[in-house]
Amino acid sequence: MDPLVLSLVVVVMLGALAPVVGSLQVALAGIHGLRNHLRRSGACLPRTVVVVPAWNEAAVIGASVDRLLAMDYPADRLRVLVVDDCSTDATPDAVLERVVRHPGRVIHLRTSEGGRGKAHALNEGLARALADEWAEAVLIIDADVQFEDGTLRRMTRHLADPRVGAVTGYIKEGSHDPGFLNRFIAWEYLDAQAAARRTQDVLGGLACLAGGAQLHSRANLEALGGRIDTSTLAEDTVTTFETQLAGRRAVFEPAAVVWAEEPPDLHALWKQRIRWGRGNVQVTRRYLSTWFRPWTRRGLSGVLFGLSWFTVLLQPLFMIASAVALLVLLAIRDDVAWVVFRAVWLTHGVCYLFLVLSAFVIDRQVATRCWREGVLFPGLVSVVIIGYAAVQAVTGAWGVSGGHPVAWLLAGWLASCMAVAWLAMRLETARGGRWWSRALLYLAGYGSFLCVVTLAAYVRELRGSDNRWEKTEKRGRALLAS
Amino acid sequence: MSTADTPVPGLVTDPAEVARFAAERDEDSRRERRLFVGQAVMLLAVLVVVAVLVAVQRA
């Protein structure tokens, strides 16, 4: 084959890398059933301080503190420290009411300077918590999350193994009356948390301790200098990496369920994910000497871990490159273009089928509740293209010539779906645009939205935009756990 | 001293509490093993679908 054509074929196939790696990740999650940290866990109830950073969280903070104190954990071994980051709403009143109601169990700490972001507030809280020898473990959470009764016990049991420095739980989208976007997020978390973190546990390297639920042993925090990183937008990921690079394990506990309120609209989600995306770019640069070095250590330096990290990070570029290469192939060798087109989309189809079916095994509750969004996660157009590729491959019917406009549309969809997802976000605030926004997101797919956010995050990083912390607004909507 | 030799704070010796932790661990282990079986079944189901498609195409 002509080297140019061969190169184009390879680039087109990059468009199928993400679903393949995603499926591999979900398949390996099953191994967690045979290989997990449970057998090294034990009866362990350390004296725990829950550090809750709060900036204008009046809508949620009271219920969160009440729920924490009502958890199935010995009352004399649990304290809640709310770090009030100079809130201007009724947050201090809500916390002080709990301080009076639960003497000695709730602490209100007002930071010296507000609005500097979560990491700074956390550091003030950590300094206060660690200054008292009482604390044997510290649980860092978000102000809006709600822990199930047995969640903390299920996390502390792993600290019975002194090699474990930190434990995280399974964050679930928990709006009582979720909109379509919350159902997409719930489905995303099923893959990105319940499945991916199990796989990372199996591979021996965790990518991120969830910001809403990370339990640290005192020894681990002291080894990290008693502070968390403030130089990036991904302080949770940096803490996770530093813990493991210092020789301690970070463990994912799927039975430790934590319910969280996620953004209700695309604009809020965009802001949140830009922060996450930029944080991941910063982490990638910071740990350049860690990636793909399986001979130095397992886990973070492993090939599979690196492959899954970079596939997520580079997926938008792969999709654009794949679409462009396919369009070029269509122009110069349309016979080869159709073969590769079918190969890419059939790979997508097989992975899609596996991911949708697996969801019902990984978390039946979420899968049953959000199956429509799961089926339409890649977008209605992509699902139709998968069906078309399957019919074409099996029967040879519905063929179109290389010069037909439909052929160009099909070939370019992997790139143009991101533009449609971006348009869905832009239309959301336009007059009468909410319906169109929703329709476009179902057409382009939630996955395409995540890709275009990542792309925007690159651009912001390249432009050196401000590392400003943009708070995700919480409305205190009822959660499933309540 | 390696991390493995570090004394563990919070270890519980009360037999009832130890038994409760063990019961929770066993229950969660069983659930994880069910996940392994379920994933294997789903993988098999997808492979069967692919095999059928390939067979139909060749027929």
Where are these regions (language model features)?
Chain A
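Short, acidic, metal-binding catalytic loop of nucleotide-sugar glycosyltransferases
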Residues: 66-77
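The conserved acidic donor/metal-binding loop of glycosyltransferases
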Residues: 142-146
